[in-house]
């Protein structure tokens, strides 16, 4: 249904495209577009329903016995394939960002600087598909993002359709790599890999926005996931290098690096303790191990990012653009939510209350909270490998809640890790409900419904019902991805 609805109700081309080539343009207008939107919406509900049913089956089996982990993992994988395969052939949906990616790559190809110039400086077929809001906006992404776009547009020229296909392939690779590594991280910590894959990769937010929307988070999250896995397997330099590659794609990946330093420190300190004939490291081993791994991490990151920046032909202007663009305002970002509530109350008393002034102040305060929260997370989750990965997820949560701009696909970095570290059941419940809610909040064309009260209420009810269906037999005090002990089985 998502596949069928995408060609009339998705983020389709303004000019040309598959419908135009087939003489089916009427599907994108009038009543036919309404039908396409309905089909797409039904597809969203069916995708969510399949995910909920799968979750219910997993958690019922988890409560009943612990004998079918391999079968459960196979079931999740087969369901994931069934979700992804139809979307391979679907049009872009829930976002027009893929057209901006192509445009930015074409700018680098044609000698423009996307860090100082907007897409409008390079007219052509790709510019026509870029959302009007972003035609005069610089890119917040790293040099690898531009390099990939440069290579794709060099190969496909100005053929937008082929460019979209190329990004679809990259998105699928990114999600596949994420799934591969998440299963192994969960196994490393003794967590249930089936549930980790269910909540972290088969999640409707991941499917809809990573494959349907083709966001560069898909590749970034894949690189970070493999980097974390390598670090856990005592391949610190390789792990940091891969995460550094992800940083050069999108700076958000850098949040994981300080926690990888903790992982590397524990490994190196353990090695130093073993050389001294001790079972566990002392502070004397931990302190030099910390500085050694920290210095190595900084050096490797600097070399990798510098090499990619140089090889891509892009400038260092991406450093100044890391903060992103402040045009996007929605309640997913805490400062926007607070400013909206303040304005709603204030307008009762002041007719011309200035929302922009309020949101600017709240964003500044929220940014300080975010920076403080990241430091606190880094320090609190330093004790061992598992705590470091948990801290990575916590830090991503802090960053996305308190950042000035937040969009659903940003949460891919957090969602992917949720099932790997044996989280408490309440966290999985909350994540499942929030995932269903967020998955329902965007239309196929890419417009959010977060200010549509009726839609928000309906989505909230559906999300609540989903959690009831999935977890009706589970104890909220238990650990979500840990296999139950034999004595707990009735």
Swiss-Prot record:
Q: Which GO terms describe its molecular function?
A: glycosyltransferase activity
EC number annotated for this UniProt entry = 2.4.1.-
* Protein localization: Membrane
Bilayer topology term: Multi-pass membrane protein
Q: Where are the transmembrane segments?
A: 34-54, 73-93, 163-183, 194-214, 226-246, 253-273, 290-310, 329-349, 361-381, 398-418, 424-444, 451-471
Source organism, top-level taxon: Bacteria
Explain the consequences of disrupting this gene: Cells lacking this gene show a complete loss of LM biosynthesis. Mutant results in the formation of a truncated LM with a reduction of alpha-(1->6) and alpha-(1->2) glycosidic linkages.
Which top-level enzyme class is recorded in the Swiss-Prot or TrEMBL entry? transferase
Q: List the disulfide bonds.
A: none
| Keywords carried by this UniProt record | Glycosyltransferase, Membrane, Transferase, Transmembrane, Transmembrane helix
Q: Which GO terms describe its cellular component?
A: membrane
Q: Which NCBIfam families match?
A: crt_membr, MptB
Q: What does this protein do?
A: Involved in the latter stages of the biosynthesis of the alpha-(1->6) mannan core of lipomannan (LM). Catalyzes the addition of alpha-(1->6)-mannose residue.
Q: What family does this belong to?
A: Belongs to the MptA/B family.
Name of this chain's protein: Alpha-(1->6)-mannopyranosyltransferase A
Q: Which organism is it from?
A: Corynebacterium glutamicum (strain ATCC 13032 / DSM 20300 / JCM 1318 / BCRC 11384 / CCUG 27702 / LMG 3730 / NBRC 12168 / NCIMB 10025 / NRRL B-2784 / 534)
């Amino acid at each position: 249904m998502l596949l069928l609805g995408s060609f009339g109700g998705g983020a389709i081309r303004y000019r040309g495209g598959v419908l135009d080539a087939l003489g089916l343009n009427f599907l994108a207008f009038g009543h036919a577009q309404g039908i396409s939107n309905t089909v797409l919406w039904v597809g969203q509900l069916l995708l969510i329903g399949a995910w909920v049913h799968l979750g219910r089956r997993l958690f019922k089996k988890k409560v009943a016995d612990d004998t079918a982990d391999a079968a459960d993992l196979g079931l999740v994988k087969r369901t994931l394939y069934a979700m992804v395969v139809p979307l391979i052939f679907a049009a872009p949906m829930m976002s027009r960002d893929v057209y901006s990616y192509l445009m930015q790559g074409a700018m680098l190809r044609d000698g423009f600087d996307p860090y100082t110039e907007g897409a409008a400086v390079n007219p052509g077929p790709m510019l026509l598909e870029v959302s009007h809001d972003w035609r005069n906006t610089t890119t917040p992404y790293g040099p690898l993002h531009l390099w990939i776009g440069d290579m794709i547009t060099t190969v496909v020229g100005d053929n937008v359709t082929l460019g979209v296909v190329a990004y679809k392939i990259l998105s699928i690779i990114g999600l596949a790599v994420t799934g591969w590594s998440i299963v192994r991280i969960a196994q490393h910590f003794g967590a249930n890999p089936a549930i980790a894959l269910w909540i972290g990769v088969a999640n409707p937010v991941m499917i809809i926005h990573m494959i349907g929307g083709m966001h560069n988070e898909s590749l970034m999250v894949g690189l970070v996931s493999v980097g974390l896995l390598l670090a856990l397997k005592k391949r610190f330099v390789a792990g940091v290098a891969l995460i550094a590659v992800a940083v050069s794609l999108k700076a958000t990946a850098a949040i994981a690096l300080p926690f990888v330093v903790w992982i590397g420190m524990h490994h190196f300190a353990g090695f130093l303790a073993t050389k001294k004939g001790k079972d566990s490291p002392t502070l004397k081993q931990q302190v030099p191990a910390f500085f050694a791994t920290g210095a190595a991490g900084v050096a490797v990151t600097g070399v990798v990012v510098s090499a990619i920046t140089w090889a891509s032909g892009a400038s260092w202007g991406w450093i100044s653009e890391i903060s992103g663009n402040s045009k996007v305002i929605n309640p997913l970002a805490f400062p926007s939510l607070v400013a909206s509530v303040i304005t709603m109350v204030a307008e009762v008393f002041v007719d011309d209350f200035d929302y922009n002034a309020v949101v600017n102040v709240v964003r500044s305060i929220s940014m300080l909270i975010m920076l403080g929260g990241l430091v606190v997370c880094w320090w609190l989750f330093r004790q061992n490998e598992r705590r470091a990965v948990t801290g990575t997820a916590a830090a991503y949560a802090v960053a996305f809640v308190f950042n000035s701009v937040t969009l659903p696909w940003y949460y891919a970095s957090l969602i992917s890790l949720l099932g790997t570290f044996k989280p408490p059941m309440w966290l999985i419940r909350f994540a499942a409900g929030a995932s269903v809610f967020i998955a329902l909040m965007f239309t196929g064309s890419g417009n959010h419904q977060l200010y549509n009260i009726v839609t928000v209420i309906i989505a909230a009810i559906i999300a609540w019902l989903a959690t009831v269906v999935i977890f009706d037999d589970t104890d909220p005090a238990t650990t979500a991805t840990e296999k139950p002990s034999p004595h707990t089985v009735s």
